[in-house]
């Protein structure tokens, strides 16, 4: 049979719709790629302090040496570790990050090294640990100063012998590069008997110190621009600008929470901003007033229960630290693991 001839306009409309659909698909792919690129965490800055860190990291990357990244909370120690991994021969293998302070002591060993079925009560199936998941790649151990003595011994064996034993299992060879990080003074921890001296020297083959943001203020405008791009994309809004007066306020602030605190401030500004430029009013009071580091005053009546004093003190310190548990622990003079435990008790 012979179909009736199609009208010319019908053909034109069909072609146009197909073209528009392809254009929209291409635009959608482009936007997704742009968001993926913008939201990828990366080291931003060009200050001498940051360049020194990257110079050492670049030299260390091709080697197999263990690296210890030092620095205050929020300075980007994990980003330095990722930089080392991405510039090493292990770049195509996994990068596995572990926050040692966020894992309860009772399961930390099994979490790192894995366990066999029936190794302990509740071990209903075999589970591989973080070392196994990082095989061929890099294992980043953040808050290394929080390791328990028993786990310190097992980690030392990995670094010395290149092998470990899963809980309830046989010896396994470890093909993993270890990069560790801490905001503690590990030499002081060694002197106090809380950290093994032999493990410290095994970790401290190459030391890199991530500088606090207050020592690289010239990077703040670059970081602000970067985070504006990230959070404008995440919140599906047009690109915002930060005028000179806003940048001046941000540059003058002391940033006790470092880059992580700056990122949180910019995310907040993107959400609250009503125009196409961030204003000083979009910034938190503590940043506008420049009173970072001045502790809030808490008053308690005589006879206030100790647990109530502790609860209010921890919550106020967390508020001051903008939810950064590591920074709050530093301000309180306790370990990060302790603050996680205390928060669990308060809930």
Question: What label would you give each PLM region?
Answer:
Residues 240, 298-347:
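Bacterial C-terminal helix-turn-helix
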Residues 266, 273-288:
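Conserved C-terminal helix/linker of AAA+ ATPases
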Residues 110, 191-233:
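Conserved AAA+ ATPase core "coupling" helix
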Residues 32-173, 177-184, 189, 213, ...:
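AAA+ ATPase active-site-proximal loops
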Residues 1-37, 337, 343-344:
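N-terminal accessory segments that target, anchor, or regulate ATP-driven/P-loop NTPase machines
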Residues 2, 11, 15, 20, ...:
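Hydrophobic face residues on amphipathic alpha-helices
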